[in-house]
């Protein structure tokens, strides 16, 4: 056990060659925000790439309860090492030219508990994309391949959390994604079109028998939006958008689910230190095979603000609807709220705080069926960093972090809890 701990602890030393580019309002939301239910702009966006090669390594120590969703009957201590390697190139998003990206992200797990071992101890992510920018037109193409093993996975690479963590605790899956987007600047407005195709291969692990059951999920989505700059609102873009598509699980006899989601959208880019973007609309879902139909309001708000004291605040609020990956007959309406704060102190010390809350309402799509369950997922993360003065590096930092994650369900079967400790070294050229 000590040998495994020592080997994986070596991953805690790493470096990151990157700049500290600020997102603006136009980059906070895009067509990917609406065609991808698991989209994270900090990982998927090509818009803020510059010439750089990056490498980052993090080691986490996890204490998990309810590994197998058996009402906290199984607990385990886990070491998790993450690595991200990539090459990115291209100019500024406002300049004509070509941006490109190729990234590998890996998660590696080792159990320190004799009663628990991983059948699939690693996650692998291969992300690639190009963006071609002309004087008035942008064309982007992204292709991703992701593979996750089951049982107690760690957080995503970009630090986000969602209900998919809870749902995938005993699910292993592969995901192939292809995304195409075109953006055209008109005289006083911008037209944006995005198309995505997702193919999932799930491996559901039966809790009591231990055998695996395979099933697929296919999703096609398109998003069309139009933004204009009103003369009466400075630094603001207002727009209309509509997302449409179809999701299908061939093993589900209820058939494919169609969706149509129109929305009002807005972007406010006050300064490099302040930007917000949001939307409000509704999500209409139906099936051709029966009389199922439901309408749910959806909304979102993303933004950041830097106070005069240099305190950096960020917020992310989202409500969305999507089919459950665990309960095949259910749709999940989730309300997510995330707020973060960063404060720099003297002597290069910084403190980062983040709180995340998600309420998930599982509703059966079968006629006459009652609500399946509701869940409250909460996460609190704190990180303490210290800037280091090292020659040849523009910026360098060592930090430690702690994250507490807990899920409370109306069915105790789905309750779980996690404590996560980590160490990270970061260097920038």
What do these predicted regions represent?
Residues 24-429:
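Gram-negative and organellar
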Residues 15-22:
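C-terminal segment of classical bacterial N-terminal signal peptides
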Residues 7-9, 297:
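Alpha-helical protein-protein interaction elements
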Residues 9-15:
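Bacterial N-terminal signal peptides
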Residues 1-7:
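Bacterial N-terminal signal peptides that target proteins for export
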């Amino acid at each position: 056990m000590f040998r495994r701990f020592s080997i994986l602890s070596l991953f805690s030393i790493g470096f990151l060659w990157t700049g500290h580019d600020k997102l603006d309002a136009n980059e906070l939301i895009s067509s990917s925000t609406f065609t991808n239910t698991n989209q994270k702009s900090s990982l998927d966006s090509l818009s803020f790439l510059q010439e750089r090669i990056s490498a980052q390594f993090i080691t986490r120590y996890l204490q998990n309860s309810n590994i197998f969703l058996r009402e906290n009957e199984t607990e385990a201590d886990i070491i998790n090492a993450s690595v991200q390697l990539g090459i990115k190139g291209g100019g500024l998003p406002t300049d004509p030219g070509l941006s490109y990206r190729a990234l590998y992200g890996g998660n590696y797990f080792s159990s320190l508990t004799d009663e628990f071992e991983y059948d699939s101890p690693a996650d692998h992510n291969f992300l690639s994309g190009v963006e071609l920018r002309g004087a008035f037109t942008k064309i982007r193409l992204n292709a991703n391949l992701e593979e996750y093993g089951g049982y107690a996975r760690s957080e995503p690479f970009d630090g986000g959390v969602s209900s998919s963590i809870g749902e995938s605790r005993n699910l292993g899956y592969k995901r192939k994604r292809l995304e195409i987007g075109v953006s055209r600047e008109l005289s006083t407005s911008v037209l944006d079109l995005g198309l995505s195709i997702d193919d999932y291969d799930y491996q559901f692990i039966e809790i009591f028998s231990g055998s695996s059951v395979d099933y697929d999920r296919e999703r096609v989505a398109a998003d069309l939006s139009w933004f204009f700059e009103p003369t009466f609102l400075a630094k603001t873009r207002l727009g209309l958008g509509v997302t449409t598509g179809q999701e299908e699980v061939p093993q589900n006899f209820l058939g494919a689910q169609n969706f149509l989601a129109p929305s009002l959208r807005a972007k406010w880019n006050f300064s490099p230190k302040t930007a917000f973007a949001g939307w409000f609309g509704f999500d209409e879902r139906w099936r051709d095979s029966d009389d199922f139909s439901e309408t749910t309001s959806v909304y979102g708000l993303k933004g950041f603000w830097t106070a005069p004291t240099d305190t950096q605040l960020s917020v992310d609020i989202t409500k969305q609807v999507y089919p459950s990956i665990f309960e095949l007959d259910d749709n999940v309406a989730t309300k997510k709220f995330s707020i973060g704060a960063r404060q720099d102190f003297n002597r290069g010390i910084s403190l980062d705080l983040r709180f995340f809350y998600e309420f998930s309402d599982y509703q059966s799509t079968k006629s006459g069926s009652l609500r399946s369950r509701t869940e409250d997922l909460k996460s609190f993360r704190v990180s303490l960093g210290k800037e280091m003065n090292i020659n040849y590096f523009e910026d360098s930092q060592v930090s430690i972090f702690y994250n507490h994650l807990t899920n409370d369900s109306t069915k105790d079967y789905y309750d779980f809890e996690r404590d996560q400790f980590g160490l990270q070294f970061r260097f920038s050229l």
